[in-house]
């Protein structure tokens, strides 16, 4: 794969020769997992209503970015995509199959031998080769599809730790995602990694420090956290909020923070976490403080991974409050960076089946019931029942007999919106998602774009920075 990396660096040089005014010292990619356009709209209204406004007129931080595009999200083998195929397009510049990560579309899912011959370099790896600082921040497991797409190359996104690897794959030399992060052969590896998923790095004999009844997941008996700490000087590991907050702002080493055995808490539940967790905005600010110390610039991936999970559970409240956490993180990044040196892109990997419907009056609570529906339904229709503005096309919220919501608080955090089709979990949706861009080279985000084009926009901005001597 090394030759492919040098090839991309050469392409970066070509971009520089053609357009020397579009290069940025830094690139920050914010990824709202599952943050379709209906999610952005609903979150915008919710944010406004939380401020005492009707809501519709409010603007999220990234709503104010000047450059906006629609992004086509399909995988090469799927009309409605998954996060592995989409993040590969975004971070490696090629659309690929559903379920594979960092490998080309010629690799069937689960085919280790084929994957070893068809790895795709990622923008994080290219940034490391170019001498830039790199970071990954996520509220999901750091080995999950989106953060994993920054550094891993596997034919199955589920190969997150050694116990998930088939025997044949082990024999052929395929490595699990957690191990690939620890052994990343490009540069010195990411300078900042903050998220969930510490069980993926811990041996099955080791109890979790926060939940002693939970054990690590690795069956190869390796403690990857200890190995990572031992492999270089100036490395620091944290797993709770107190340790995170104690990290000195002037710290120049590499930082690993794994705050949960699996995914981090939803933003709505974060304050109740036993060990304490930093917010997405706090992790973003920490990462920016560390990465900005590199005079060559940096690449940072920030994922709000639990937006997706809230939708899968049919729980709009948690999906939207996690979207607001992403909004706060974007605002923090805008405040902390120079637009003349930094490209910021905000997008989603795919959408969800969330709908905004009915004819609610202006300012009606977005999580509430449609308050004007009765005037639009014939009085002869005795079967009319209240319904919510937000709903899902499918998922866990299906009711064989439609319930009477008259006395139900649909704005409650645990309320599950009604779904039209019964499924064990709500699915992704296939419509285009939005991309918002600001700063240097943001004009490359425009029109209707194939998802893999985002990689090329970011690469054009990041490599061959004209301020570099």
Cite the ranges covered by each PLM segment:
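A post-motif C-terminal structural segment
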Residues: 25-26, 35-88, 113, 143-469
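Substrate-binding/charge-relay-adjacent region of secreted/lumenal peptidase catalytic domains
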Residues: 97-100, 174
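Bacterial N-terminal signal peptides
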Residues: 9-17
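Glycine-rich phosphate/pyrophosphate-binding loops
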Residues: 119, 124, 129-149
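Structural beta-sheet core signal
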Residues: 29-30, 136, 346
């Amino acid at each position: 794969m090394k030759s492919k990396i040098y090839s991309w660096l050469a392409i970066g040089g070509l971009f520089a020769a053609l357009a020397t005014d579009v290069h940025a010292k830094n690139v920050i990619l914010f990824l709202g997992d599952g943050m379709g356009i209906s999610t952005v709209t609903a979150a915008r209204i919710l944010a406004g209503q939380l401020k005492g406004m009707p809501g519709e007129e409010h603007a999220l931080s990234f709503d104010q970015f000047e450059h906006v595009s629609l992004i086509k999200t399909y995988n090469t083998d799927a009309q409605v995509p998954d996060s592995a195929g989409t993040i590969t397009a975004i971070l490696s510049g090629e659309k690929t199959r559903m379920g594979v990560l960092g490998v080309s579309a010629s690799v069937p899912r689960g085919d280790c031998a084929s994957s070893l011959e068809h790895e795709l370099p990622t923008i994080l790896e290219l940034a490391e080769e170019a001498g830039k600082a790199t970071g990954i921040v996520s509220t999901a497991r750091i080995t999950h599809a989106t953060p994993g797409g920054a550094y891993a190359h596997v034919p199955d996104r589920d190969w997150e730790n050694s116990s998930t690897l088939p025997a044949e794959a082990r024999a052929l030399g395929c490595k699990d995602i957690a191990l690939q992060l620890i052994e990343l052969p490009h540069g010195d590896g990411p300078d900042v990694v903050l998220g969930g998923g510490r069980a993926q790095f811990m041996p099955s004999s080791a109890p979790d420090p926060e939940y002693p009844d939970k054990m690590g997941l690795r069956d190869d008996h390796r403690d990857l956290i200890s190995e990572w700490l031992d492999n270089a000087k100036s490395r620091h590991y944290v797993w709770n909020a107190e340790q995170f907050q104690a990290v000195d702002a002037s710290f120049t080493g590499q930082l690993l923070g794994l705050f949960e055995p699996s995914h981090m808490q939803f933003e709505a539940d974060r304050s109740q976490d036993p060990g304490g967790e930093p917010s997405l905005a706090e992790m973003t600010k920490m990462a920016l403080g560390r990465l900005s110390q590199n005079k060559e610039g940096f690449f940072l991936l920030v994922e709000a991974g639990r937006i997706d999970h809230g939708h899968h559970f049919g729980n709009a409240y948690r999906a939207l409050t996690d979207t607001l956490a992403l909004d706060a993180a974007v605002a923090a990044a805008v405040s902390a960076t120079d637009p003349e040196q930094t490209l910021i892109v905000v997008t989603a990997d795919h959408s969800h089946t969330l709908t905004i419907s009915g004819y609610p009056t202006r300012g009606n609570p977005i999580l509430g019931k449609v308050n004007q529906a009765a005037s639009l339904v014939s009085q002869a229709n005795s079967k009319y029942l209240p319904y919510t503005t937000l709903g899902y096309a499918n998922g866990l919220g299906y009711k064989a007999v439609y319930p009477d919501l008259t006395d139900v608080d649909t704005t409650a955090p645990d309320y599950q919106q009604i779904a039209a089709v019964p499924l064990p979990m709500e699915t992704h949706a296939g419509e285009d998602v939005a991309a918002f861009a600001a700063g240097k080279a943001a004009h490359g985000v425009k029109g209707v774009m194939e998802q893999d084009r985002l990689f090329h926009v970011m690469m054009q901005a990041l490599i061959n920075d004209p301020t570099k001597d």
